Amino acid sequence: MDKFKTIEGINSMNSVDDQTGQANRLATFEDVHGLKSSDFEVFLQNIAPFSNSEGKPYVILDGMGGYGDVTAHILAEAKKSNNVPEMYIADESVNQLQRGVTSGTLPEDFAKDHLVVTDIRETPFSNNLFDTVVIKMGIHEVPLQEQAKILKEVFRILKQGGKFVTWELAFSNKESQKIFQDILRKKDEIAGFTQLVSNRWFPTEEIRQSFEKAGFVDVDSPHTLEPTVNLRKRESELSSVERTKLMQKNGAITVEENDSLIKLGKQRCDELVVFTKQYMTSVTSDIKQAMNYRETEDNVIFEPEKKIFVGYKR
């Protein structure tokens, strides 16, 4: 396989993505979305198999893979049957890729030259390279007009007969989509994720048509997931920009600094809860019910719609 720009030899402290919101987010997907282990089991079932009928390992790309959580789950599942695929992780954030190594999310023996620094909309990979491409909750991170580029690029780098599996938001109505988008944009604004505020666009069920326009066939959404968004679970994320800057400056965080960051995260979460409660006063009861929206004295909880989509390149 050709050489790509990987995390080896890159000084993440000086990389351009330190100024973007995505690179500074230090929250785990599982924490902020209240996922169950069964959700990932279903996801893995749709990604499988990990080799062909002759036992040759598949080449799988974890696109927009961040710190490698999906890859770690795939490898753990595949090792149960001694059926380990060749994994690559692609992400434009050097920080996120390096976090996969330093946090222990990825196995110690994971090849560093398989951590590829690239924008998923225009990758360095050759045509027809991967047996499977996976993207978990990544498509919504780019503007609406750019999302089609992701699907077209995935189609290009997939082998004939290859499979694309994505776990993504898929709102059944535009009202719920707008509510979720407005609340998450406010969260990003409070946290200082300036790039995410302007870039994010959360899909509706129309994403199925986008798959087909890109060339995918037999597009299906075999599973609907019901994760829980608990705003209080966002406290650490809301102070992660400051936490990252302190780590970059000093290499460590003191007890006093950590206490201040915890306090800052709580204060910002208080602000987000107040905003959300006020925002939801104008939302109809049927939409609230569809979102399973509920409030407590200091928290807001709701359940966005997410689905697993599968499409094939024939």
Predicted stretch roles:
Residues 3-44:
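Class I SAM-dependent methyltransferase Rossmann-like catalytic core
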Residues 33-57, 73:
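Conserved alpha-helix/loop element of class I SAM-dependent methyltransferases that forms part
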Residues 61-122:
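Class I SAM-dependent methyltransferase SAM/SAH-binding core
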Residues 121-133:
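A short acidic, Gly/Pro-enriched loop at the edge of an enzyme's catalytic core
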Residues 148-160:
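A short glycine-rich, Lys/Arg-flanked "PGG" loop and its adjoining helix->strand segment in the class I
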Residues 165-188:
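Conserved class I S-adenosyl-L-methionine
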Residues 199-214:
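Short alpha-helix
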Residues 220-314:
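Conserved Class I S-adenosyl-L-methionine
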